[in-house]
Amino acid sequence: MANSSSGLAVNDECKVKFRELKSRRTFRFIVFRIDDTDMEIKVDRLGEPNQGYGDFTDSLPANECRYAIYDLDFTTIENCQKSKIFFFSWSPDTARTRSKMLYASSKDRFRRELDGIQCEIQATDPSEMSLDIVRSRTN
């Protein structure tokens, strides 16, 4: 279904891969991109379960916007093992203005398509999505 504000559709693979991450933990992360030709949000990269947060941040292009999902494992103060699913809106300052506008106008609707997201991070610079910042959002 097309996004009314931006005219973008969400490719079915996005929802399928997200459900696999959420229910079977098949992936550690998913990176999504907007395909300007098809005017559709598509899966760009899939992170294997053994890949870490550094692999995830390295997979984001330095000069292009992306959406992403990361399944973070952590230990609570009570020493309980937990995980949370994070939604990232990556919009580096060096990205094209048109791209930043397209990603910004599509974000909320796309996020609603992915049921089960627990936290959101918006970043324009790698320092805004450091592992310490992400961990601080688990409380």
UniProtKB/Swiss-Prot annotation:
Expressed in pollen. Pfam families: Cofilin_ADF. It comes from the Eukaryota. GO terms for cellular component: actin cytoskeleton; cytoplasm. GO terms for biological process: actin filament depolymerization. Actin-depolymerizing protein. Severs actin filaments (F-actin) and binds to actin monomers. Belongs to the actin-binding proteins ADF family. This is Actin-depolymerizing factor 1. It comes from Zea mays (Maize). The gene is ADF1.
